[in-house]
């Protein structure tokens, strides 16, 4: 990612936070899209997905498609690609909701 790309990736963070993102980011693995994943959990387990509606990295329409294909419980938020940084409270709430739902389903099983 070039320095100007940070605004596209994390545009809802402050300038100082964007500088930290730039300073600490790393390039993805060169063979990222050729890797085979064994045992994709979303095919057999409940899933949750946060669609970042202002994401300039992965288009929200693609995120919705993926989430629907997964059968995920979908949350949408006005966020860039990094809602875990810009909207951590919502992300924590979704994680807790998911954990509680899974816990309830295993207790009732």
Question: Where do the model's predicted regions map?
Answer:
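Helix-rich cap/lid subdomain of alpha/beta-hydrolase
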Residues: 1-39
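Alpha-helical elements of Rossmann-like donor-binding domains used by nucleotide-donor carbohydrate transfer enzymes
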Residues: 4, 20, 62-65, 90, ...
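Short secondary-structure boundary/capping segments
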Residues: 38-41, 64-66
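Short, proline-enriched alpha-helix->beta-strand connector loops that line the catalytic pocket
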Residues: 42-47, 69-72
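Conserved strand-to-loop "acid loop" that flanks and positions the catalytic carboxylate
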Residues: 46-55
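Conserved alpha/beta-hydrolase "acid-adjacent" motif
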Residues: 56-62
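Catalytic active-site module of serine/aspartate enzymes centered on a nucleophile-bearing elbow/loop
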Residues: 72-109
